[in-house]
């Protein structure tokens, strides 16, 4: 069942304790001719671009590193996902004893913080950790604080924040059309584009409202 939560962190501004210099393709040993679509740098902004091949990398993997997302407006946060990036770890197969320890905090003013996710005493390997917040909070700023990672580098491809904003809900699109193709299993679906939209939800099925 759809909770109504939306991705609040997409393309939002990010600042960090540090970031590594250089470019990812060079660091990974790729040349101009064979490098994949990946991060050209290790900047904090890579955390909110929803691109799994880009990532932020701190200068160290220690417990003084952090990143902070500005949601640009207050919102109620219900879940957070941390997707770590396996950058030059040279770790293969199932290795016992790996663990990720961190905390995620939220704040309305950037000064007073509350804990959203507490993984300080976590002793499990959680490279793509999705956590529903026990006590959803109304915040504007979301901060990840690193404690321990099992890899040589602290690299994160996405820090995703889910919840409900306080803006106006989007309306139904206009001029929605469905045109069946020769093979009736196929159809062309069109509608008028909506300015500044991030995406569209299309409901389909046999019910009249789908």
Which positions does each model-derived feature cover?
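Conserved, compact domain cores that house catalytic/ligand-binding motifs in diverse enzymes
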Residues: 202-208
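Surface loop/turn signatures of beta-propeller and other carbohydrate-active proteins
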Residues: 122
């Amino acid at each position: 069942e759809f909770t109504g939560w939306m991705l609040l962190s997409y393309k939002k501004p990010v600042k960090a304790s540090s970031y590594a210099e250089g470019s990812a393709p060079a660091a990974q040993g790729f040349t101009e001719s064979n490098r994949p679509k990946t991060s050209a740098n290790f900047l904090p902004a890579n955390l909110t671009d929803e691109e799994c091949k880009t990532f932020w990398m701190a200068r160290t993997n220690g417990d003084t590193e952090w990143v902070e997302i500005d949601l640009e407006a207050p919102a109620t946060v219900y879940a957070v996902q941390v997707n770590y990036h396996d950058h030059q770890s040279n770790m293969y197969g199932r290795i016992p004893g790996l663990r990720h320890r961190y905390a995620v905090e939220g704040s309305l003013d950037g000064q007073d913080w509350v804990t959203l996710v507490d993984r300080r005493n976590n002793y499990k390997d959680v490279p793509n950790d999705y956590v529903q917040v026990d006590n959803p909070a109304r915040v504007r700023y979301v901060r990840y604080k690193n404690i321990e990672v099992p890899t040589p580098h602290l690299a994160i491809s996405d820090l995703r924040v889910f919840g409900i904003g306080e803006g106006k809900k989007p309306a139904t699109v206009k001029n929605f059309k469905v045109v069946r193709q020769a093979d009736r299993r196929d159809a062309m679906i069109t509608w008028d584009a909506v300015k500044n939209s991030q995406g569209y939800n299309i409901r389909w099925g046999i019910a009249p409202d789908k």
